[in-house]
Design a protein with these regions (language model features):
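Pyridoxal 5′-phosphate
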Residues: 1-196
Length: 196
């Protein structure tokens, strides 16, 4: 919401998918009610959104692309690198919902073309109620605050920071990254047993 409302002058097109988490669906629907035009991509039979679908939907006036990395219900892993490649020469803001991906796929795989990525602690055994909005290094991505009343968090969100939750998030993130390879092997073994 904050990025679209800040940057939306003259560019009113958004691309997302019909199977996003409600944390993305509802804000995009709100932007649609505000007058933004939304192209809703439908998944294939395996629950994936392809880079070709994104390329077909992309327009000159596309302001924002918001797609998930790992689906919260199906577990499908989308081609974030493919999306980034499609968007290489486009000015659209690229947001990745990475909440389900953290601790399950290597974060080194986050392409530099990603402008924003959202994470939440409880998806990798951290505390509830704390998350991170990663802002990439590309210039020009600005966010207007949705809440007002203080200058905390660089003026984007008011209120005293919950240090205990931030430390809990950071500790859980470190543990998740340390255990990533081992957990992936274990889950792969379990998947093979299930298929047998």
């Amino acid at each position: 919401l904050g990025a679209a409302r800040y940057s939306g002058k003259g560019r009113g097109h958004i691309i997302s998918s019909t199977i996003e988490h409600k944390a993305v669906l509802d804000p995009v629907r709100e932007l649609e009610r505000d007058g933004f035009e939304v192209t809703w991509l439908a998944p294939d039979k395996d629950g994936r959104i392809s880079a070709d679908q994104l390329l077909t939907a992309l327009r000159e006036d596309t302001l924002l692309v918001s797609l998930m990395w790992v689906n919260n219900e199906l577990g499908t892993i989308n081609d974030v690198a493919g999306y980034a490649e499609v968007l290489t020469d486009h000015e659209a803001i690229f947001h990745v919902d990475a909440a389900q991906a953290f601790g399950k796929v290597p974060m080194r795989g986050l392409p530099s073309r990603v402008d924003m990525a959202s994470f939440t602690g409880h998806k990798f055994y951290g505390p509830k109620g704390v998350g991170v909005l990663y802002l990439g290094s590309r210039s020009g991505v600005n966010i207007s605050p949705l809440l007002f009343g203080g200058g905390q968090q660089r003026g984007l969100r008011p209120g005293t920071l919950a240090t205990h939750q931030i430390v809990g998030f950071a500790t859980a993130a470190e543990l998740a990254m340390d255990r990533l390879e081992r957990d992936c092997e274990r889950l792969s073994d379990l998947g093979e047993q299930l298929v047998e």
